[in-house]
Amino acid sequence: MSAIAIEISARVCDAGGAAAGGDGEAVGKGAIGARVPLVVQTAGGSVTLLTRDADEALLLRARIDAWLTGSADDFRDVPLAEGTAFQQACWRACCSIPRGETRSYSWLAAAAGSPRAARAAGQAMRRNPMPIVVPCHRVVGSGDWIGGYAGDARQSGPTLGIKRALLQLEARSSDVNSPAS
């Protein structure tokens, strides 16, 4: 029986906790906020469960760390391990949304090639395997309705504060990184 190689990396930030896992080929799972039980145990360190390519996992962690402190990384080159063709198209389109900006689910559906599939685009965001790498917090409802986050569609759910915190973090770092007028 062959072992499956998985690296799990966790970090605590202003928006909550973030964790990523993958097999050395592609990122398979990521979580943020309450969905990251390892964050409490590791307090920002990492736990390796059998890894084929620790360097790649450490590089992704370093990139996420840099993003959390203001780097404008769009993560478009990070391969994702799951998802239908439409979900993958939505996730890649989401990665094209500039830091500090938002787009609607309708925009996302159109950018993914299915302009009439706003609800399906919302479901793709709900199934996002890697929050931050695929910045689903940048996708909002029409009229800037904030919507759910990290699979929690409730308007009063605990992850909604994380979505707001990530948007505020990006707004602050966008203000700091933009040239003075």
PLM regions and their residue ranges:
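Regulatory, non-catalytic segments
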Residues: 116-131
